[in-house]
Amino acid sequence: MSELKKKSLTRGQLGAIVGAVAASLLVTAFLGWSITCPCDFTPGGLLFGDRAGEEIADWSFANDVSLCQIQVGGLLPYSVNLNCMATSSGGLYLSCSVCDTKRWAGVVVGNDRARMRLDGTVYPVTATRVMDPDELDRAWVARVAKLRVHNTPINPAPPVGT
């Protein structure tokens, strides 16, 4: 009888095993979700890809890719698909209509460090909300120019003259 007691698990040991299995399943699910998303309108977690070593000064190449992704947050990363566009001087802008309702934009207010993935490469960035009307106009002109090249049914180019 005493041998049987020695071989059985205590409640604490069983709880630890169940907890470890549950934690590993959650980590596996999060990594799987991060690998496949952000996708369409579903946010993702970590952005994987080749890593650029330093921040980029000239983002003009951003106009050559149709989709950009941003990752914000620290402990629990949050990433979304969005439009990004560069001005003729190489400045990078991100589309954010009704920005106050976007989770990623709210996170950036408290922590401006983020990561952008363009064409499989992940870049460190510092995100700043633009409020200056002249700078917003430059970003809008860059957005319209890019959407005329990368026009999709989900993200159509604005009508000429806007």
Label each region the model flagged.
Residues 31-78:
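Short, conserved active-site entrance elements at the starts or edges of catalytic domains
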Residues 62-99, 117, 124-128:
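Short beta-strand segments
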Residues 14-33:
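Hydrophobic membrane-insertion alpha-helices, especially the h-region
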Residues 47-50, 62-64, 94-96, 103-106, ...:
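A short linear-motif detector with a strong N-terminal bias
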Residues 1-12:
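N-terminal Lys/Arg-rich, disordered targeting/topogenic segments
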Residues 24, 99-162:
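Short, structured beta-strand-loop surface elements
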Residues 18, 77, 82, 161-162:
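Generic low-polarity alpha-helical segments
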